[in-house]
Structures are given as structure tokens and as C-alpha cells.
């Protein structure tokens, strides 16, 4: 990824999946008129849907998630479920 490139990260509130607390994340960027995205889950730091990112870029995103799991959960705890889904 280019250092000058704008990459947006959107996070959900804390949710439950298989009786475990999780946060859904989405990285997005616009490149050449197309919306690239990678949707994943923390704390697994895995991605469910990816479009437009290379394998190397996805590896960088996974590394970012692993390094920031606690920060992501702290921010997600501030989000009200209704507020998230109404955006």
C-alpha cells in the first residue's frame, strides 16, 4: 500500500459470535474509481470478504489488526448498536 493512500477503517460495536465477543472490521479505499475493501473479524484477525487488495496488503492488514486488537475493542465498546446500524 502506498504511504500516501487513504485507507478507512470502520468497526462495529462488540457483538457475539459462537458465544465469543467479536468486532467486525472493514478496511476501504478508492483506487482507480473502484472501491476496494477487506471485511474481517477481531480477535480472530481473519478476513471473510476481500476485493482489490493483494495478498501482501492483506497480510499487512492482518498484522495491523493483531497489533491493535485491544484498541479496536476499546473503540467498539463506545459504539451503540442502533447508532452503528443507522449510519
Which stretches of residues belong to each language-model region?
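Negatively charged, low-complexity tracts enriched in Asp/Glu with abundant Ser/Thr
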Residues: 1-13
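Structured catalytic/translocation cores of nucleotide/phosphate-coupled proteins
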Residues: 2-5, 34-38, 86-87
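A generic structural signal for short beta-strands and their flanking turns/coil linkers
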Residues: 7, 21-23, 59, 68
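Short, surface-exposed, charge-dense and proline/glycine-enriched linear segments
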Residues: 7-9, 32, 69-72
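Acidic, low-complexity intrinsically disordered segments
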Residues: 51-87
Amino acid at each position: 500500500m502506498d504511504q500516501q493512500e487513504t485507507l478507512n477503517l470502520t468497526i462495529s460495536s462488540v457483538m457475539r459470535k459462537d458465544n465469543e465477543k467479536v468486532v467486525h472490521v472493514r478496511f476501504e479505499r478508492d483506487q482507480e474509481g473502484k472501491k476496494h475493501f477487506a471485511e474481517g473479524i477481531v480477535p480472530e484477525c481473519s478476513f471473510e470478504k476481500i476485493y482489490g487488495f493483494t495478498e501482501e496488503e492483506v497480510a499487512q492488514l492482518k498484522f495491523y489488526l493483531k497489533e491493535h486488537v485491544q484498541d479496536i475493542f476499546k473503540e467498539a465498546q463506545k459504539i451503540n448498536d442502533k447508532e452503528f446500524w443507522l449510519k
